Amino acid sequence: IYWVAAFLCMACSDDHGSNQENEGASGSVTEVTPVTSDLSVDLSTDKAFYKPGEKVVFTAEDALPAGTKVRYRLLGEVVGEETVNGTSWIWQPPTTDFKGYMAELYRQENGTDVIVGTIAVDVSSDPARFPRYGFVADFSQEKTAEKTQEEMAYLNRHHINWVQFQDWHNKHHWPLGGTRTQLDEVYMDIANREVYTSSVKNYIEAQHRFGMKSMFYNLCFGALKDAAADGVKEEWYLFKDASHTTKDSHDLPGGWKSNIYLVDPSNKEWQKYLNERNDDVYVN
């Protein structure tokens, strides 16, 4: 139980004890409503963060009792307050950039504010200012639109605004499953696990509905054993010997698709090649 103490505001004397200017003035008391908590209402918002000017849609898991109120706080300041009912309502936050607010749902009982639910709101034009990272790493057939929406709703409740796709790609040097014009329905990741293109897309679509940013993981200096067939040149690699017979590599467990052979990330031709392969991903 949290109680807010009343503060007694008294006129103060100067350094010499003189109080002539306020002589005869009586002390004043600021009354503060006591507060307690009963966090029984689950709240959610429709996005992980909001650009200045965007409206926030709040949803309560169950219908709110009559007389329920919500106040919006910026640190110790209350910037808005209203009565709400039903299971959903809309709030227009102030347009100041890079501010975080607390929505505080409460009811009044015997002169006490009883907090029944809280949730934060991030108003930022650029999510990189306050990054909150999450990850997805399973792209099997069971990751349907419904399943990925449910998972991203959970991350959204934690205000995750960036989601990284870990080991989603076909090959480090050729991340897309298929080609720019013909996607594969299913392909194998580096550990020879099935990756469904539909599952990858389901995650991206669910994340974008919550305003999250999707980003894919890849190396800027790695290629697999069949890279020559995909256009990777021998002179782009890093070698362990002066005669350039043994490529440097990151060895992986047996049964995986390939070891990762190290490429010189400063090589301009390699950079151009990998940029083109990344563009294959973005156009799809």
Indicate residue ranges for each PLM-predicted region.
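Bacterial Sec-dependent N-terminal signal peptides
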Residues: 9-37
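An acidic-aromatic substrate-binding cleft motif
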Residues: 116-170
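Loop/turn elements at helix/coil->beta-strand transitions in domains of secreted/extracellular proteins
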Residues: 129, 158-163, 208-215, 284
